[in-house]
């Protein structure tokens, strides 16, 4: 029968490798297109990650995401997402590795949280943008899409510039909304840099040079949130590239 949700395989289990792993959730997502997502409990120490990735490489697996969830004196927990043609064989080899103590198969972050809208700036404006973004994301998520909304209230040119540049390092971040009354200087330069890397940037209509550097300028914060979600939703017929004007 199917394994209970959240089940793990303890290292050395006599059962067939993979038989007690959490199934890859597939509602709205084809298993053939979804990465194999695993939480590995390993021993701690130098060379552990090298050993794990070596096993994956031996199966021609392509690691699309990796993070260290927990690192203790004795035990480390790794989260990996891997594209592989033979998940069963890979799991079998991980099962017999002397560095792996337990394996849990989970749903990928892309499947659970999907694309991310990042909102930053002044708290009052961020809150209003979030209302629009969350309301619009709800419409698309009901139809099977996955869009999540992240917010951080920040003030100051340097903190905001650092945060803008960091967005491109966030997994699955697709659009950034800058919400405030005045932004320019180093923030403008950061906006131009992340846009060059493919990130969509929407700015509220504010003082400073950031609006001029952004893809889109929206006066109403709620509408800005709505348009941010529409810009990345696959279930919406909306494209910033097709707009005849940049300011709304």
What are these regions (language model features)?
Residues 1-20:
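Compositionally biased, low-complexity flexible segments
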Residues 12, 18, 58, 235-239:
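Amphipathic, positively biased hydrophobic alpha-helical segments used for protein targeting
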Residues 25-120, 136, 151-155:
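A conserved regulatory-domain signal marking ACT and ACT-like small-molecule sensing domains
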Residues 106-239, 243:
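Conserved mixed alpha/beta catalytic, RNA-binding, or beta-rich assembly cores of soluble enzyme
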Residues 246-248:
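CheY-like receiver
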């Amino acid at each position: 029968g199917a394994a209970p949700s959240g089940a793990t395989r303890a290292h050395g289990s006599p059962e067939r490798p993979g038989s007690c792993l959490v199934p890859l959730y597939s509602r709205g997502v084809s298993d053939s297109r979804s990465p194999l997502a695993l939480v590995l409990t390993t021993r701690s120490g130098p060379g552990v990650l090298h050993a794990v990735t070596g096993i994956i490489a031996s199966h021609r697996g392509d690691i699309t995401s990796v993070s260290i969830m927990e690192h203790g004196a004795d035990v480390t927990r790794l989260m990996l997402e891997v594209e592989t043609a033979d998940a069963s064989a890979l799991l079998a080899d991980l099962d017999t590795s002397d560095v792996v103590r337990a394996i849990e198969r989970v749903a990928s972050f892309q499947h659970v949280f999907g694309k991310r809208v990042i909102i930053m700036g002044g708290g009052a404006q961020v809150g209003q943008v979030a209302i629009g973004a969350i309301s619009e994301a709800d419409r698309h998520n009901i139809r099977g899409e996955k869009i999540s909304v992240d917010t951080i209230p920040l003030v100051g040119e340097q903190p905001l510039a650092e945060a803008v540049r960091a967005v491109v390092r966030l997994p699955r971040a697709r659009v950034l909304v800058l919400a405030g009354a005045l932004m320019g200087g180093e923030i403008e330069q950061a906006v131009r840099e992340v846009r060059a890397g493919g990130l969509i940037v929407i700015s509220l209509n504010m003082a400073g040079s950031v609006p001029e550097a952004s893809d889109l300028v929206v006066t109403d914060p709620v509408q800005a949130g709505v348009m941010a979600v529409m810009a990345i939703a696959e279930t919406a017929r909306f494209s910033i590239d097709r707009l005849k004007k940049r300011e709304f």
